[in-house]
Amino acid sequence: MPWTQGESPLIKQHRKQSKRPYLFAYTLLFTVTALLVYSFYWMAGKSFIWVVDGWDQHFKALVYYSQWLRAGARSLLVEHRLHFPTWDFALGQGADVLTTLHYYAIGDPLNLLSALVPTRWMVHFYDIMILLRIYLSGLFFSLYCFQMKKQNGMAVLAGALSYAFCDFVLFAGVQHPYFINPRMYLPLLLIGVEKVLAGKRPYLLIVIVAVAAVSNFYFFYVLVLLTVIYVAGRLISLYHGEWRQMGMPLLKIAGASALGVMMSAVLFLPVVGAFLSDARIAVDQNSILFYPLRQYAYMPAEFLAHTGVSGYTYTALGFSVLTFPAVMMLFRQKKTNTLLKVFFVIGIGCFLIPFAGKVFNGFSYATNRWCFGLAFLVAYILVTVWPSFVTMDKRDCRYLFVGLSVYLVVCLLIRYSRVTQAFIVLGVLFAMLVLWQQRTKQGAGLSDTAIQVVALAATLLSVVNNSFWLNAYSGSNYAARFVDQKDLMQNFSATAENAVKAVAKQKKVTEFYRYTGHELPWNTDLNQHLSSLQYYWSLSSPQISAFRWDMNMREYLLYRYHGLDERASLTTLASTRFFVKKEKSKDIVPYGFSKVGTRVVNRSAVQNALDAFAEEQGTDKPGAADTKRLQKKVEKRYTVYENDYALPLGYTYSRYLPQAEYQKLSSLQKQEAMLQGVVLDKAPQHCASVQPQLTAQEVPFTVSCNSKDVTQQGNSFVVTKKDSSITLKLEGLSASETYLSLRGLTYAGTSEYTLYNDDETIDPLNRYTQTDWDLLPYNDRKKLKDDHWYWHEPATLNIKISAAGRSNTLPLSTPEYTWFSGRQDFDVNLGYGEEGVSSIKITFPSIGIYRFNTMDVVCQPMDNYADQVNALKEDVLEQIKVDGDRVSGSIQLDTPKLLCLTIPYSKGWSATVDGQPAELLCANTMYMALELDAGQHTVQLHYQTPLLNAGMGVTAVGVLLFVAVIVVTERRKRRDA
């Protein structure tokens, strides 16, 4: 091996050359396999950008990161200072660049290459990097095999392809490109461990720990757990329980790992700090003893084939065809490879038990993103057992025949494992069994080399088979869920922000502003460099999350939200100037926003369509009718509204509301109170507290069930047919916003079959009796029974609420939901109306019981709104300059006031007033404030990522220690040579 110590240069050169044929063979086979596996994307004209997180997060973050890197390099070349802005107002209302985008782009060392790629080619870079990560994961697996003295090239090739193209990669690797990274690091980490155990240099372990920690804090945690299990097993195996002998190797591994973490601290510390302060950490996720029965029903077939069970738990195995007989042969061999057997039993046990998935997920919810470790193990078992496929005798063949037959019967008996793709793989295995059986006859069958070639070909084809059933149109058509290559960059640029920018330009708006909208594409603000009220990144501000929780926003994810429910007061207090929506959308527009105009945001795409049609018809340009028809099909039209009461980035209060008094108010009272006084944790020196004048009123109503499929039972509604509805009759207030306020809202679902159990709790009107059941056709009864057997409660529901031609949706999650936050209190804005609302319709989407503690209708008169906002606008921050992580402005005050800055609160911000340090207060839960005396003031704000300086210091010490380790180690090696 290239790393072997004590060898002459000639021997080292020979070892390097001996691996070149393998490298060539692996590269060739990988290329062929990748072309076949991903051909379904290319034939469909698809990129590897998933339409959900791939498009909404990963790709947009990568484009931003490449521009961010170039901006930093430009600052060095032009300004002669290296400066990377660490704050950007285009991350929602504003967020830390390093900690927010680390998970998506910044952590991956390979993404540094993006600085060299123009934005127009970024989609190709994105796709190529996915293939490169997969290639490297298989290559590094091969290196581990060689480190462990596995010298059969075909065996290692089969294992590498199995590891590189298992179902986890086919499914999750293109969804989330950085899920592939830990697959690259794991074999290198284990090689590093093996080197330390062999008394060799620890450099590789130190460097890979540093790279893994920098790359992704989440998967670094997973890698640590996997490595700890591996090290424990290897130490016990090597030293046979002699605990004293284990101490020194364990100390060396721990020391090398700690040094690697120190070297990574420049990014690792800030990101971990942000993670530990994230609102999701405080959420007590629901624990379950077992997965839903349906998930277990998929698992037999999932071992060898893609079944579609993956979902949010990433229960994705889909190993290559020979891994199943390899595992069988492993357990057939007595008193050998004991550690592999133990690891396999542990791995399968963890795979079956949700608590293990919870542990691997940082004690959050249960998910199996760690199963790449199981894929590594199974692929290595295949490499280890491979020689048995050449030396197999009749008893081995009978043993495999019985095992495969049992596996076949299990798949046939279980509904969700009764899938074609599994039977195809089993057919290949039985065919292989025939070939092995033939070889047991004297002088018959294929040669040793030929049988290995056939086995390797079967491995490759089984991977392609899994890809077919996952990606092909005739299979699950998974590739259809990815973004089209054609016009991708045009669509990337043609966003609602173009309409906002056009209106801002028309209005000659030069100062800082924000925009908002409902159901806009996620994170388009980032690449358009506009600040907005939408956000969808994994790490979020705990202050913003707390604020939205206080306001009972209608959302069930703490880190993904659109706007502020179009509530006028909150939207204005957030310095929002524009509201944008699709032209024909019926989205609620906040009170006080006036229509400015409608803009087409994709004119280039429209022109391309017109040019293509003209060329097809052989004319200079389409006729008027065709032009109108094509425009109607292609145009993306957005309507922009401007806030008549817009507030700037900094506005002032003359009074404050103590946090303790604020918390005594209801959520709707809180939003009204914030128009009258800024909410502070501590009393300012020169401003008095306020006693807010609250005008919101609860309105009495009566409930009418619109059919016998929904029944009111006290504080609950029992629904026996989906999409059943109720109507609230009331006399709402005029010139008011109207809210439906729900407290303690929960849902308990039931299957349709259960309705026939004569249980008045779920069927209070006895409409589903035994007689009704007996009258159902046999096929209907059979289907209801089968569905009930695998039924589990819906994880999310969308309750539709409408009034006066306006509608809103209340998304409700249950404890079954992977990211259940525990939120049960909601205030749903039904918009502003000059006339009072007379009825509210609530539509329940699923069968079950909807319970609540209280349900109220609240009207918020807007009579005082204009005066309250204008009072905040009397004295504002002017001449505002926003330059990444620096904000400055000036203000003139006649009396002492509190300057509220609508910048999300963070300890990374510092302020000076007239050149003197000033204390930044947390204001209105999520913003910042400065207490100012009367007079003219210059305000300057500066941001630096929390713990970044500390991380730099630790990294510097770590690098120096690493250099010292190298010097000491090499001197010792030369001395001992």
List PLM regions with ranges.
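Periplasmic/ER-lumenal interhelical loops and adjacent helix-loop junctions
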Residues: 56-59, 63-68, 72-75, 249-253, ...
